[in-house]
Amino acid sequence: MRVSIITETWPPDVNGVAFTVHGLAHGLAARGHSVQVVRPRQPGIIAQEDAVATLAVRGAALPRYPGLRFGLPCGGRLRREWSGMHPDAVYIATEGPLGCSAMNAAKHLQIPVCTGFHTRFDDYVGHYGLGWLTPIATAHLRRFHNRAAATLVPTRELANELSQLGIGNTRLLRRAVDTRLFHPSRRDATLREPWGVGDNDPVVIYVGRIAPEKNLGLAVRAFRKLQSRLPGARYVWVGDGPARAALAAHNPDFIFAGTQLGEDLARHYASADLFAFPSLTETFGNVTLEAMASGLAVVAFDQGAAHEHIANGISGMRVPADEPQAFISAAFALGVDDVLRGAVRQNARIAVAALAPETVVAEFESLLKRLTQENSSGNPALAARI
């Protein structure tokens, strides 16, 4: 197949969408497909993708996240590009101006389109004092995704939520986790030493954007309760974002490791003991899978990855979304009970063992083939290329 993937975020951007889309693109290429990635040009970075073709378009900085960019409209360029390339399918991962241009161009050229639902922007805007934009964002998401032949979602729970928003024709595509990279064997005593913890002192870790929409105040409260029982406990924060400065100013004992990638990120996960993830705005939460693969005891709200992959009390703790006190209690229980935490850590890795990237890419390939077949009955040339 010839597949064009449109995304407004791509490595070296550090977020779950960028990593997920990068894995899907390179996974398809490894299976012999011709893959084009359309994304905003990243200043100072030369596109060097051996396995996939890159079409870099104009972009602009995202407000409050200067390191991230969104693509500007480029419908005419995409129509010209695809008129020559003739992609069998288009996958649009993001709903910004670039994604909208891609949708219009694909529809104009009668190319089958599917979308991915990665971010609840309708939830995010309220955390930045823009709650009045919520109905506008919801209407945009509904209109955008309903133009696609299918919208790919990582959980049945999200499919049900989107159905309530009026977004139909969702199909399940699980998220992958690299269990070879994220592994308990990467635990590193030399990394823990500067954290000032002994062998038996629990380390709580947070990985992700340090931003208002992540509900970080609850994580702080949960840690302080644990620390009141275990003064040697430490809280390590991996990532960056607009809330970091204030968080550090109010919590001088917290350890901020900055952005970590690859094996360094895996070492940080494995060198901790408990992953407390307080976010209520995730469509999935890839970091939950990474923490579980690393053998951490996870406490999270009962949604996204936690809902899908945590057996409560066995491979982690998941609590109702409207019960912040239950989150604090669950984190405390996992932190103070060494036996419980040890059992949960072993079971956590087992729970995600089947989510290998190769398996998920094969599922993505199958979905794209089905999409093209459903649209090729009147186009024998298209069917012959599949």
Protein language model annotation of sequence segments:
Residues V197-R224:
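Conserved donor-binding/catalytic core segment of Leloir-type glycosyltransferases
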Residues R41, E157, A176:
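Carbohydrate-associated surface elements
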Residues A326, L340-A354:
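A short, well-ordered alpha-helix in the C-terminal region of glycosyltransferases
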Residues R244-D264:
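Nucleotide-activated donor-binding/catalytic signature segment of Leloir-type glycosyltransferases, i.e.
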Residues L280:
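Aromatic "clamp/platform" in nucleotide-sugar-dependent glycosyltransferases that forms part
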Residues N312-G313, M317-P324, A333-D338, A353:
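Conserved acidic donor-binding segment of nucleotide-sugar-dependent glycosyltransferases
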Residues W82, H145, T259-Q260, R267-A272, ...:
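Short alpha-helical donor nucleotide-sugar binding micro-motif in glycosyltransferases
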Residues A297-A300, I310:
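Short hydrophobic beta-strand element within catalytic cores of glycosyltransferases
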